[in-house]
């Protein structure tokens, strides 16, 4: 029945219902004299409930338990917490327990902190446990050690004898009685955590077997009952916030989870497993051997599920396993079947296992990407730095499947645990294990560390106890068309001295079904047989791909129809000819093709080696067969004459060394039998170079145009002082805006500039109408290329002096005004180049500064009345004329880019002189109940009478090719409009707005300023 006052003591009402006579509830604390235990079936919280310093002891049962078989506690958005409490010591009790189903739902927060449970059932127990709809779930600094462990003396850690394995099965079942375990959750059927909104956190908890979860299998059949075994499950799904398991410690195995099926599904936040540890305090490792397949003690730094599966699927956030440790096997995970689909980034880093599998230990592993990337980095173990594929149970075959479907999978810096250690991405303990390595589209599966599969017939260092007479097949891209790459590129000089750091081995038959298998940068791959008639084999400098004798039923032959060359790896003086070999026959089929493979076509053809002729001794066919070991046919280069930027020329391929064409060392390469040579012939004797237009970098000289316009914006902000008749000291503060749209012109780039900032001005206005003032300001903004992915973020600092005076010319008042301005601007350019090969952007960055100046002298005079056609018009509309002389220009500093396709821009400059002329109109407005305002309108024509277009020299750093670059060729004729409005808001205060439009062919500039001033 639902929880009520009639069925429960007043003390528990204070805790579970926050008794408050209908007023707002507040957290309640239970004192040590509270009567326990409490029993119920349906419990509702009307307020926050806190259990603090509760002691259940050895005589009491669960603190909260079910009257019958099932218990439901509904939080109604309140908090339930246990702090500094001790649970019951009795075996079948916990803090909260139910005989069948336990449901905890709709809490604002469910929190257990600094509690101790010595009972077998831990803290929360039931055959089925469900936590759903909570705001957050927190288990922090709890201890769930089970006291019977103390019967094992510390001085003589004699482990219990392992249970004998069934004759028909060689499963990975543990050898320790299930009674000797302790976990926060103890379930027989399932634990499900779902729909948590803010976060799930298990931090710094301690236990024996599985600190957080221990699955207690109910095997009635095994005990004489008529039932069947029930596999417990641990599920975390549909959680919105972060899910984290950090610094949990298990003394015997499974740092977080021990036994049962584990599933993380459809969670939106990140999932983090960090710093979890599984020790082996019972000494199970010493009591068992790998041959028995019973060794789980100290296994699984995070999850130890030796008889079941672990799956991650549909999770939208990142997944991180780092700094987890296992005394046994599986630094993060030990399981029977492991499956992971990466919808976001997944990282296994710095995990360690003293035995096998620094990150993962399992006989069946299936890992794939679905929009995210997967990185295995700096994991360590005795066998398999990142992954150890263990032997499958009797009668079954292990499998390793890695699929980079939509996102890369990378193994880098994983090591064996001996010192100094060997690089090791994966160790496959059985030769019968099948291997499927796949990549789709532009995704890549990259092994910077080797993969080794046992080959007992070849004398492997650790032969498989159950070696199959027929090694498992190795398939490349059975379900993809991307790149599977083995490379030794990341090895340090000392690591390169140890050949095992770069050697991968598969004893079975290797088939390239699609896409490409890449072996490059000194990597070695040996297999039983090699067949590449559908997919491509791409080889790089120093690579070796060979079919070697060793396993039964292998004919150790190599047959290829599609070849590729990792071109960039051969363009260094330290290149080495690749080897394609076999202990049997090596065949390059008739009609074979060769692809020029390169990550960046632009970078390759920037290489100065292509100025002249070049020979590349690409690959040597090698066979140990006494006769007819090598069969070679002519090879056709695909897209040999494809258009490209950079140095121009053509390619050819032949099994005969060409004459008078040096290699990348500058030497004539040796004439070696069965070697395929590639030859480059330049289009001209002087190395014709074709520049990619997007690499011109016209934003650099155009920055002088932009800086000049910014100074003009600064000048327009002073318009209030030029038209004012006030007398006194005037201080003003302005907001400035600058918008310039420069259109593209044929193959010339345009730009779009947006800048905004402020201007502060101080000026003295004298009684004779003269003024003198100074101004300071800054503008911040960005200039974007109109044609390419390039932008320049700049900030400009400006300082100016200005003045005005009145002069009498032939009895007519003439206004003379002037200004000199200096600007210092800092520019940071970021350029992106879209790479057609990778379908990604390459990036480069640089920064430089400009020094700019602007000066003008102008006069406002009624010369329109001197001209008969304009006299009457000027009088009717009270128009006057003006004329100015303007000079603007600047210098840009040199700069060198960093990143991809780098360039060097030399110092540049640009200058412009113009003679604006036009008319001025004034209008005064007096609107009732509104302050008076004065409108000034300038219209005119601005011809540029002398110009040096901004320019500089751009140099390609890779080859020193220099190209003069000019800014946009602006039209020399422009029309402009200036509108200024002053609002007299106070006797000593003014508000004003100024707008200017400068329009010329293929460029439009808008300048806006507004502000306030104060007259003193």
Swiss-Prot record:
It is found in: Secreted, Cell wall; Cell outer membrane. One of its GO terms (cellular component) is extracellular region. Residues 1-24 form the signal peptide. Transmembrane segments: none annotated. SUPFAM superfamilies: Autotransporter (SSF103515). It comes from the Bacteria. Pfam families: Chlam_PMP, ChlamPMP_M. Keywords: Cell outer membrane, Cell wall, Membrane, Secreted, Signal, Transmembrane, Transmembrane beta strand. Its main location: secreted. InterPro entries: Autotransporte_beta (IPR005546), Autotransporte_beta_dom_sf (IPR036709), Polymorphic_membr_middle (IPR011427), POMP_repeat (IPR003368). Residues 697-1016 form the Autotransporter domain. It is a peripheral membrane protein. Belongs to the PMP outer membrane protein family. NCBIfam families: POMP_repeat (TIGR01376). This is Probable outer membrane protein PmpH.
């Amino acid at each position: 029945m639902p929880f009520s006052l009639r069925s429960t003591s007043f003390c528990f009402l204070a805790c579970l219902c926050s008794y408050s006579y209908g007023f707002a509830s507040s957290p309640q604390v239970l004192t040590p004299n509270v009567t326990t235990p409490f029993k119920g079936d349906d419990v509702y919280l009307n307020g926050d409930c806190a259990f603090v310093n509760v002691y259940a002891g050895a005589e009491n049962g669960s603190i909260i338990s079910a009257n019958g078989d099932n218990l439901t506690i509904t939080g109604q958005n309140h908090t339930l917490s246990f702090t500094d409490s001790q649970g019951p010591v009795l075996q079948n009790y916990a803090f909260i327990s139910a005989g069948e189903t336990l449901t905890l739902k709709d809490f604002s927060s469910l929190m257990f902190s600094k509690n101790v449970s010595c009972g077998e059932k831990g803290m929360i127990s039931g055959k089925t446990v469900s936590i759903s709809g909570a705001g957050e779930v927190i288990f922090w600094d709890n201890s769930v050690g089970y006291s019977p462990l103390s019967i094992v003396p510390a001085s003589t850690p004699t482990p219990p004898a392992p249970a004998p394995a069934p004759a028909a099965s060689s499963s990975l079942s543990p050898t320790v009685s299930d009674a000797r375990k302790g976990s926060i959750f103890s379930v027989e059927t399932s634990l499900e955590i779902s729909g948590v909104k803010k976060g799930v956190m298990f931090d710094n908890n301690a236990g024996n077997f599985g600190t957080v979860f221990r699955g207690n299998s109910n095997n009635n059949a095994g005990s004489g009952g008529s039932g069947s075994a029930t596999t417990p499950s641990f599920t975390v799904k549909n959680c919105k916030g972060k899910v984290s398991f950090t610094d949990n410690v298990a003394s015997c195995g499974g740092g977080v989870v021990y036994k049962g099926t584990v599933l993380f599904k459809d969670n939106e936040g990140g999932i983090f497993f960090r710093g979890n540890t599984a020790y082996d305090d019972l000494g199970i490792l010493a009591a068992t051997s790998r041959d028995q397949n019973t060794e789980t003690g100290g296994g699984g730094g995070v999850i130890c599920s030796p008889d079941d599966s672990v799956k991650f699927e549909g999770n939208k956030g990142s997944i991180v396993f780092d700094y987890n440790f296992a005394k046994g096997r599986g630094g993060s995970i030990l399981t029977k079947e492991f499956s992971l689909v990466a919808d976001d980034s997944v990282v296994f880093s710095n995990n360690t296992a003293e035995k096998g599998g620094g990150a993962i230990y399992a006989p069946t592993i299936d890992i794939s990407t679905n929009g995210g990337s997967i990185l295995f980095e700096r994991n360590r173990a005795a066998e398999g730095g990142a992954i150890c594929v263990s032997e499958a149970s009797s009668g079954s075959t292990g499998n390793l499947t890695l699929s980079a479907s939509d996102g890369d999978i990378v193994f880098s810096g994983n090591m064996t645990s001996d010192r100094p250690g060997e690089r090791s991405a994966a160790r496959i303990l059985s030769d019968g294990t099948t291997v499927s390595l796949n990549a789709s589209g532009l995704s890549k599966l990259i092994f910077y560390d080797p993969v080794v599969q046992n080959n007992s017939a070849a004398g492997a260092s650790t032969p498989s106890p159950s070696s199959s007479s027929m090694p498992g097949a190795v398939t490349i891209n059975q379900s993809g068309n991307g790149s599977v790459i083995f490379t030794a590129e990341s090895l340090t000089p000392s690591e390169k001295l140890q050949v095992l750091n770069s050697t991968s081995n598969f004893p079975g038959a290797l088939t390239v079904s699609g896409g490409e298998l890449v072996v490059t940068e000194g990597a070695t791959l040996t297999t039983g047989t090699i067949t590449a008639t559908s997919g491509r084999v791409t080889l790089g400098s120093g690579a070796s791909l060979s079919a070697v004798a060793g396993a039964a039923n292998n004919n150790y032959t190599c047959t290829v129809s599609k070849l590729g060359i990792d071109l960039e790896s051969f363009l260094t003086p330290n290149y080495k000819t690749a080897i394609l070999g076999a202990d049997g026959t090596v065949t390059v089929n008739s009609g074979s093709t060769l692809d020029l493979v390169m990550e960046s076509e632009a970078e390759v053809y920037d290489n100065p080696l292509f100025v002249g002729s070049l020979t590349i001794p690409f690959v040597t066919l090698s066979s140990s067969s006494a006769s007819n070991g090598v069969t070679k046919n002519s090879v056709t280069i695909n897209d040999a004459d494809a258009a490209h930027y950079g140095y121009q020329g053509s390619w050819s391929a032949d099994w005969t060394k060409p004459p008078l064409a040096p290699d990348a060392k500058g030497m004539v390469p040796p004439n070696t039998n069965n070697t395929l040579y590639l030859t480059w012939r330049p289009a001209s004797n002087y190395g014709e170079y074709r520049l990619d237009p997007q690499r011109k970098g016209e934003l650099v000289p155009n920055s002088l145009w932009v800086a000049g316009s910014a100074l003009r914006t600064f000048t327009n902000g002073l318009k209030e002082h030029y038209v004012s008749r006030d007398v006194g000291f005037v201080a003003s503060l302005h907001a400035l805006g600058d918008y310039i749209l420069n259109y593209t012109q044929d193959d010339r780039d345009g730009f779009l500039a947006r800048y905004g900032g402020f201007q502060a001005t101080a000026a003295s206005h004298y009684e004779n109408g003269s003024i003198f003032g100074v101004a300071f300001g800054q503008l911040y903004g960005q200039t974007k290329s109109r044609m390419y992915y390039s932008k320049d973020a700049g900030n400009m600092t400006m300082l100016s002096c200005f003045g005005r005076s009145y002069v009498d010319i032939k009895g007519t008042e003439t206004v003379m005004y002037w200004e000199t301005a200096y600007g210092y601007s800092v520019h940071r350019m970021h350029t992106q180049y879209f790479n057609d090969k990778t379908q990604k952007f390459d990036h480069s960055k640089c920064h430089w500064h400009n020094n700019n100046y602007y000066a003008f002298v102008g006069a406002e005079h009624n010369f329109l009345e001197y001209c008969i056609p304009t006299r009457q018009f000027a009088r009717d509309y009270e128009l006057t004329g003006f004329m100015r002389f303007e000079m603007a220009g600047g210098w840009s500093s040199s700069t060198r880019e960093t990143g991809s396709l780098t360039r060097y821009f030399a110092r540049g400059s640009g200058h412009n002189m113009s003679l604006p002329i036009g008319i001025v109109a004034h209008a005064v407005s007096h609107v009732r109940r509104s302050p008076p305002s004065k409108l000034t309108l300038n219209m005119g024509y601005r011809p540029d009478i002398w110009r040096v277009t901004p320019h500089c020299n751009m140099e390609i750093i890779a080859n020193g090719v220099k190209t003069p670059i000019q800014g946009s060729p602006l039209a020399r004729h422009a029309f402009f409009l200036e509108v200024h409005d002053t609002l007299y808001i106070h006797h000593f205060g003014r508000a004003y707005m100024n707008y200017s439009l400068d329009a010329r062919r293929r460029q439009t500039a808008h300048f806006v300023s507004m502000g306030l001033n104060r007259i003193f």
